From Swiss-Prot:
Coiled coil: none
Chief place of localization: membrane
Biological source species: Rattus norvegicus (Rat)
The protein, known as: Glutamate receptor ionotropic, kainate 2
Outcome recorded upon mutating residue 621 to R: In RNA edited version
Source organism superkingdom: Eukaryota
Length: 908
């Protein structure tokens, strides 16, 4: 057996101990976790010992420590301090206390004045300062140890502006809580100059939660589009007060800038019809996010709200979610910087933390998908640059997502998954509406019944049937109320106030105006109209004219004055042509002594007077002793006889009608006739669309008519159509009213008639308050009724009456050129033909005479023409063949003639 020396044993034992200690140190070193402290500074809250942000801060640190996924070798601890609100001195003191303990980052506080004090210290000592609420940021902040997880309000302001543009608002009221609200909404406040937007800015009361005086002013000013910049707690109180004041109706639309709108209890408002829109940054569609929020709710870490606060219990607010994400973002930077250690820092020594700059850079470079979506920062100013907002809106099921917004793509409105409209008031189903109307036959009238009737059953008429059809299509119920002052609606020239149904729509006393309410420009400026359900125009209602007996000279009436003038001209023309042709035609000259065929004298009976006599005899159908002999003159005579036959026959036929019927003569035939006289008074319904038309018209005729009506306002303007109709029946009065009503009245009163055509063109529409969500639905329903033909059927039902007997025309129309102008053409053609025939006869006879007299054709023609043109002579010598005699006989003949001719001596 070998013996080991004691010295060697001690050496081996010593080495074994060293190896064991080294192994133990290595094992200890590998199993040791790094401890890192975060600091949190939070304000005291009234609801409990800890606010939502502090609870979320602790909840996030504990979650990271439990999971060990993000920081497997690091254990986080925290130091939280409480300060009073707005106490920046205390905030600075607490920050210095935490820095002396050694913290890697400071979270909070939330209020801007306290946060600025803490940030100043963190900048000096190089410690990251993490914010989760909005704080006004200076433009140059590149060296700041600061990041904010709250979305930049310049982006939020653009999101709100995009919503305003999407809803097509023209007027907006901005209500803010404190002065920082004006800074946050700078993009919106600058919008009026660029987007033609009228902006009104109001501030909530500072020392009280009572917003009723402000809401009362807004209600009086009819401010229906409102943007509230306030906390969700204050928003809940405002909604409760608005409900009590009747401002939670479909005409109001509220946009809230708070990202905690989903935390409000909206159960009392679901069926009110109010439009409520806001944004949400919590990514609730992510399953991991939903599980964390559910765990938060189950652990009930947050103190429950007060019973009357209007807030939901168990919801993680946006501030809490942002604080939860802030802790995780800083932890991501810690994971990337394992060699980082914290050290105690003293505020009075101004010695910065040596790892601060690197750690701050890692925080700004960090990326994290948290409860509030993607988180990235601007490396220069530390602001959050990438985020998504859900657009949420109140529906009957509660607040639902209707779209998204992000800084890059802007607003993207999406349809509801259930296929429901984005706005709650787009649906009229099961809604109860107040309908204002006016008694106007046949549109609205009391139903005749032996039993007493109540409610809507009291009324019937065209508009009542229309309202019933609209109710069936859209599914709403209604209550009919007669307008209090019995007027349609007109604006007072002095104070600009409206009356009638228009006023009730402006004041939201009624939801619809279903009546014969004309769509006009001035009304469209204060209320909205649907598409017209009836098209019409202004016309004149007047008594039917009395009949008059034929006058002394009524025998002239069968032919128009133009025809009488043309007949006279035709008579003169035919007579002259007959005279000329008769003298021109050789065959119209005859031997006046038939017993002496050797006579060289011929005669022409168609002198100028005889030609006129021939025409008169034919025209009077009496004939004359003159008979044309030549073909040309016979053509003239025949055409003239044919002409007189047609004229006399037409005259005789039309004369019977003129002498046997009464003539209906109206003193006016158009609006121009009314304007040119003052004997017949005329007017319209006071404060109606017809009166407004004449009042606003720039056309000279209508302006003159309005001057007449306004000068006799008390006597010519009536209160209703019924009064105007009675005045027409009982006095010399013309009533200006809508053509459809005139059509209805004249069907039932045969003593009335419409004078002239339409003065203008317009339509009746269903009136709604300005900006009403019901208008488009009403319009679509009206178009549907029009396509189905139901509007026409309803009009036939109410306009068709017993009717007046069909009246035959009580005044025959005088025959004009368009009736018998053709006979003048035939007459002219006959005259032209006769001229050509006469020329032919003349040439033919001249040729024969030239051959007979052994002379040239031209000389014979000239001689014949010379004799024909001597209009004063009825006789001329007949041409004879030349006779050859001896000279002595000629001398003897001249001697004989000289003895018989008188004046021989004078001539010699």
């Amino acid at each position: 057996m070998k013996i080991i020396s004691p010295v060697l044993s001690n050496l081996v034992f010593s080495r074994s101990i060293k190896v064991l200690l080294c192994l133990l140190w290595i094992g200890y070193s590998q199993g040791t976790t790094h401890v890192l402290r975060f600091g949190g500074i939070f304000e005291y809250v009234e609801s409990g010992p800890m606010g939502a942000e502090e609870l979320a801060f602790r909840f996030a640190v504990n979650t990271i420590n439990r999971n060990r996924t993000l920081l497997p070798n690091t254990t986080l601890t925290y130091d939280t301090q409480k300060i009073n609100l707005y106490d920046s001195f205390e905030a600075s003191k607490k920050a210095c206390d935490q820095l002396s303990l050694g913290v890697a980052a400071i979270f909070g506080p939330s209020h801007s004045s306290s946060a600025n004090a803490v940030q100043s210290i963190c900048n000096a000592l190089g410690v990251p300062h993490i914010q989760t609420r909005w704080k006004h940021q200076v433009s140059d902040n590149k060296d700041s140890f600061y990041v904010s997880l709250y979305p930049d309000f310049s982006s939020l302001s653009r999101a709100i502006l995009d919503l305003v543009q999407f809803f097509k608002w023209k007027t907006v009221t901005v209500v803010y809580d404190d002065s920082t609200g004006l800074i946050r909404l700078q993009e919106l406040i600058k919008a009026p100059s660029r987007y033609n937007l009228r902006l009104k800015i109001r501030q909530l009361p500072a020392d009280t939660k009572d917003a009723k005086p402000l809401l009362k002013e807004m209600k009086r000013g009819k401010e229906f589009h409102v943007i509230f910049d306030c906390s969700h707690e204050m928003a809940a109180g405002i909604l409760k007060q608005a409900l009590a004041m009747g401002m939670m109706t479909e005409y109001y639309h509220y946009i809230f800038t708070t990202l905690d709108l989903f935390a409000l209890d909206v159960e009392p408002y679901r069926y009110s019809g109010v439009n409520m829109t806001g944004f949400r940054i919590l990514n609730t569609e992510n399953t991991q996010v939903s599980s964390i929020i559910e765990k938060w709710s189950m652990e009930r870490l947050q103190a429950p709200p007060k019973p009357d606060s209007g807030l939901l219990d168990g919801f993680m607010t946006t501030d809490a979610a942002l604080m939860y994400d802030a802790v995780h973002v800083v932890s991501v930077a810690v994971q990337q910087f394992p060699q980082m250690t914290v050290s105690s820092l003293q505020c009075n020594r101004h010695k910065p933390w040596r790892f601060g700059t690197r750690f701050m850079s890692l925080i700004k470079e960090a990326h994290w998908e948290g409860l509030t979506g993607r988180i990235t920062f601007n490396k220069t100013n530390g602001l959050r640059t990438d985020f998504d907002l859900d657009v949420i809106s109140l529906k009957e099921e509660g607040l639902e997502k209707i779209g998204t917004w992000d800084p890059a793509s802007g607003l993207n409105m999406t349809e509801s998954q259930k296929g429901k409209p984005a706005n709650i008031t787009d649906s009229l189903s099961n809604r109860s509406l107040i309908v204002t109307t006016i008694l106007e036959e046949p549109y609205v009238l009391f139903k005749k019944s032996d039993k007493p009737l109540y409610g809507n059953d009291r009324f019937e008429g065209y508009c009542i049937d229309l309202l019933r059809e609209l109710s069936t299509i859209l599914g709403f119920t209604y209550e009919i109320r007669l307008v209090e002052d019995g007027k349609y609606g007109a604006q007072d020239d002095v104070n600009g106030q409206w009356n009638g149904m228009v006023r009730e729509l402006i004041d939201h006393k009624a939801d619809l105006a279903v009546a014969p309410l004309a769509i006009t420009y001035v009304r469209e400026k204060v209320i909205d109209f649907s598409k017209p359900f009836m098209t019409l125009g202004i016309s004149i209602l007047y008594r039917k004219p009395n009949g008059t007996n034929p006058g002394v000279f009524s025998f002239l009436n069968p032919l128009s004055p133009d025809i009488w003038m043309y007949i006279l001209l035709a008579y003169l023309g035919v007579s002259c042509v007959l005279f000329v042709i008769a003298r021109f035609s050789p065959y119209e000259w005859y031997n006046p002594h038939p017993c002496n065929p050797d006579s060289d004298v011929v005669e022409n009976n168609f002198t100028l007077l005889n030609s006129f006599w021939f025409g008169v005899g034919a025209l009077m159908q009496q004939g004359s002793e003159l008979m044309p002999k030549a073909l040309s003159t016979r053509i003239v005579g025949g055409i003239w006889w044919f002409f007189t036959l047609i004229i006399i026959s037409s005259y005789t036929a039309n004369l019977a009608a003129f002498l046997t019927v009464e003539r209906m003569e109206s003193p006016i035939d158009s609006a121009d006739d009314l304007a040119k006289q003052t004997k017949i008074e005329y007017g319209a319904v006071e404060d109606g669309a017809t009166m407004t038309f004449f009042k606003k018209s720039k056309i000279s005729t209508y302006d003159k008519m309005w001057a007449f009506m306004s000068s006799r306002r008390q006597s010519v303007l009536v209160k209703s159509n019924e009064e105007g109709i009675q005045r027409v029946l009982t006095s010399d009065y013309a009533f200006l009213m809508e053509s459809t009503t005139i059509e209805f009245v004249t069907q039932r009163n045969c003593n009335l008639t419409q004078i002239g055509g339409l003065i203008d063109s317009k339509g009746y529409g269903v009136g709604t308050p300005m900006g009403s969500p019901y208008r488009d639905k009403i319009t679509i329903a009206i178009l549907q009724l029009q396509e189905e033909g139901k509007l026409h059927m309803m009009k036939e039902k109410w306009w068709r009456g017993n009717g007046c007997p069909e009246e035959e025309s009580k005044e025959a129309s005088a025959l004009g050129v368009q009736n018998i102008g053709g006979i003048f053409i035939v007459l002219a053609a006959g005259l032209v033909l006769s001229v050509f025939v006469a020329v032919g006869e003349f040439l033919y006879k001249s040729k024969k005479n030239a051959q007979l007299e052994k002379r040239s054709f031209c000389s014979a023609m000239v001689e014949e023409l010379r004799m024909s043109l001597k209009c004063q002579r009825r006789l001329k010598h007949k041409p004879q063949a030349p006779v050859i005699v001896k000279t002595e006989e000629v001398i003897n003949m001249h001697t004989f003639n000289d003895r018989r001719l008188p004046g021989k001596e004078t001539m010699a």
